[in-house]
A protein has these predicted regions:
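Residue-level recognition of tetratricopeptide repeat
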Residues: 79, 113, 145-148
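Structural marker of alpha-solenoid helical repeat scaffolds
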Residues: 75, 109, 140-143
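Register position in tetratricopeptide repeats
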Residues: 92, 126-127, 157-158
Length: 158
């Protein structure tokens, strides 16, 4: 009998603890930040694979990242970082038109976003719009950052 009562008390405490946890919102991601972080990690891994010329494996990771980032975007449409990586993943999977849309949307939120300006510039180089790429470079001018250096080098190669 004592064992049954102990079990019932344990069960009641467990249920209350679980309800309190759920009610507090702990473990829930209302902003999409964990989806964003997962997507960003996948992109970082994919970039490393790309450097090793493992293009198909990289593309698979970009597609997985895209899935996470689209879900993050559904939860937080005003986050320039999400828009940056969403545009990046789309560009890397060949959807330049949609990538450009998200980059431009991100610039409306943060016109000086270093990543968006660099990656949008790269998109413009990839789509033979060098004048527009140079505009992005001009925005980055003076930042003394790798984004400027990388975009400048890419423009000079083309």
């Amino acid at each position: 009998m004592k064992l049954v009562i102990t079990f019932l008390v344990f069960l009641a405490l467990s249920v209350n603890l679980n309800l309190a946890f759920a009610a507090s919102g702990a473990g829930l991601d209302s902003t999409g930040s964990s989806l964003y972080k997962s997507g960003k990690k996948l992109i970082i891994k994919a970039k490393k694979l790309e450097k090793k010329e493992k293009i198909e494996k990289a593309k698979t990771l970009y597609l997985k990242a895209l899935d996470k980032l689209e879900k993050a975007y559904d939860k937080d449409k005003k986050n320039a970082d999400i828009l940056n990586y969403l545009g990046f993943a789309l560009r890397k999977t060949g959807d330049f038109k949609k990538a450009e849309k998200f980059y431009l949307e991100g610039l409306k939120i943060d016109a000086g976003h270093l990543g968006i300006n660099e990656y949008l510039g790269e998109l413009y180089v990839q789509t033979n719009r060098i004048d527009l790429a140079k505009e992005r470079l001009q925005v980055l001018n003076g930042c003394k950052c790798e984004e400027y250096d990388e975009l400048k080098e890419l423009i000079e190669k083309n």
